């Protein structure tokens, strides 16, 4: 499984081996396509492609690859219920790369799963500042407000 994940991450890194401007242009184009499409399966495919781009650190160097590996490790920990360890790992990634929206989003998710809704909202706020179109963060924001019974938000 670990070898498959590394191959997947490496292939995504190669696929998205573009500078930040190219990456942003690709995201812009995907969001335009997403807005225009009327087909559910096309929309889901575009959504998946956007999420895959977000999961890969935008830097095309060894450091970016390592941060991407750490993010996937944190996701595995989170999915395995090791929330404290996942939180620590996402915090480490954020300390190294505070401008990577997906690291903030993943930590917000862990905080939500730990019932720390206000802290999760704080991380979501940063996620959305870095990537205002982050539909996963917007969804997480709604879930946090529901848990806090702040339905008006």
Language model region names:
Residues 93, 126-127:
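Canonical positions in the second alpha-helix
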